[in-house]
């Protein structure tokens, strides 16, 4: 089942021993279209730090209750490799982060999550002492330019093959694999236009210089795509319906 990313903003995040904050953003890979991290707003707990939670710590997006629970303690999160909130996430940092928790690198293998198709909920294991954190990393400080903020891309213009076709309003994410299967596009007027769903596989590229998503669809194809409707946020399990 698909989940609206927009509906998850502000959801509470919990550790094994207490709350840690709420969902602020999602970082996704714009090559494979998979969410790699939940960005947590921890308030005054860890100020100035970019706190990332891998789907390996959460498992499925849909959990009973109103809190997304991570299979981690607050101490584990606090002691995890730190990165300043304004810094890009480098592959070197990711290697250190994954090694700290003892999880397999998602960039090794052909699957969405490396050697596995889904981010299995895993208990962190103590890494082997002496194993270099940058064993599979590129040059230090080199950011992974394909890791993008969903909050930042929301609002980008959509450019079809024959002209402007609207703007990005939301993303639809698979609850088990965390793959972004569809983009929600607001067509026409920003206030009166309809919201349509197009496959992420139709995206040719994203230009971050001019805030535009380019797709291999025509404007007519976008306008004739399945219309997007969401159940009310108060529903027990917000189900997305295509009409």
Predicted segments — roles?
Residues 1-243:
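Peripheral interaction segments used for macromolecular assembly
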């Amino acid at each position: 089942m698909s989940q609206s990313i927009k509906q998850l903003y502000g959801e509470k995040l919990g550790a094994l021993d207490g709350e840690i904050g709420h969902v602020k953003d999602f970082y996704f890979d714009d090559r494979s279209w998979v969410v790699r991290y939940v960005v947590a707003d921890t308030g005054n707990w860890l100020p100035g730090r970019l706190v990332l939670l891998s789907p390996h710590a959460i498992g499925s997006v849909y959990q009973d209750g109103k809190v997304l629970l991570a299979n981690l303690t607050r101490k584990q999160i606090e002691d995890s490799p730190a990165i300043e909130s304004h810094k890009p996430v480098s592959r070197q940092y990711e290697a250190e982060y994954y090694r700290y928790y003892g999880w397999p690198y998602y960039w090794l293998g052909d699957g969405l999550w490396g050697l596995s198709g889904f981010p299995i909920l895993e208990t962190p294991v103590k890494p082997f002492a002496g194993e270099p954190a940058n064993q599979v990393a590129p040059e230090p400080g080199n950011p992974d330019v394909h890791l993008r903020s969903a909050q930042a891309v929301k609002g980008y213009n959509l450019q079809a093959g024959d002209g402007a076709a609207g703007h990005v309003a939301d993303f639809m994410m698979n609850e088990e694999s965390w793959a972004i299967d569809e983009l929600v596009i607001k067509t026409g007027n920003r206030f009166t236009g309809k919201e349509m769903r197009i496959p992420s596989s139709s995206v040719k590229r994203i230009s971050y210089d001019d805030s535009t998503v380019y797709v291999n669809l025509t404007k007519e194809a976008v306008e004739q795509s399945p219309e997007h409707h969401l159940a009310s946020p108060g529903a027990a399990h917000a189900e997305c319906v295509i009409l």
